[in-house]
Amino acid sequence: MASIRSGLVTLFAAVLVSCSSGSGSSSSGSGNGDLQASIGPIPLKPSEETTVCMVMPLGNTEDVVLDGFDMKLAPGSHHLIAYLTDAGVTAPNTFACSPFTGVVIGTDVPIAFANAEDISFSFPKGVAMDIPANSNIKIEAHYINATANELQGHGQVTFHTAPKASAPPYQAANFLAAGTVDISIPPNSSYSTGPLFASPPAGTHMVIVTTHEHRLGTRAQVWASAKEGDLSHEITDDRNWASPAWRTLSPQIDFDGTNGLTYQCDWTNTTDQTVTFGESALDEMCIIAGYYYPSQGILGCIGHGCKTRQ
């Protein structure tokens, strides 16, 4: 499997141009349009870090639209991503996988993401994601046990859906991510990316934004910029890497081909080693993510442009 570094380089610079066994998981419907999926328990020894995946049927017998989701993660969870996938069912067994590779390469489509223990999200009225009938869901769960005791990793997702056939008019949404792999933080030092600018395609609209750093992160900021260099309209300022905000943008950001997003990540390296970009929770990342519409596919941004994953 491709590493997350090479995958993100591919996502942000090229591709977008064009597992140990475990147990525990389920998916089910609640009878009110909600569909649920879970993973775990995943036993974690002290200082253990692992990423596991599992594929299960979502349980939707007809085409539905996703209006929002709730995620609840147990202590020790670093992140959880739910994807639409064409892969075959593995549940109740898990398998080892690399974090974020389903975002950057392949054909899996991320539909829900949590980087905090409790996330609730609803799309604005008139925006939703398409989920075909009889879909399979892949759950990717990244855990790190920083305690002196054993932990049991667990994650649950509740998808709020409605039958597509009877849904009111909506615009189809998709996932957008921007970031950099150019991270090298000297020992016992502070470091900043400085402002980085990306301009999503004209005619698209961003409706939610969140940020993602690892344990040395001290601040992640995002601005809605009329042009490169404009820092007059800050839309998020996360100072707790472990619990970044999910911000619904009101008003939404309407991209016109000139305006865009500016983002900046800051860190303080309290270790005696240089810390660089990487997939481990002991490495670092600088990613902003969110949802946009109308869907042109998964968008990844580096430099000024954003391109669709092929």
Where do the language-model regions lie?
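Ser/Thr-rich, Pro/Gly/Ala-heavy low-complexity intrinsically disordered linkers and tails
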Residues: 1, 12, 16-32
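N-terminal export and membrane-targeting signals
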Residues: 3-8
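Alpha-helical interaction segments
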Residues: 9-10, 231
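Beta-strand-centric surfaces of beta-sandwich/beta-rich domains
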Residues: 31-205, 210-310
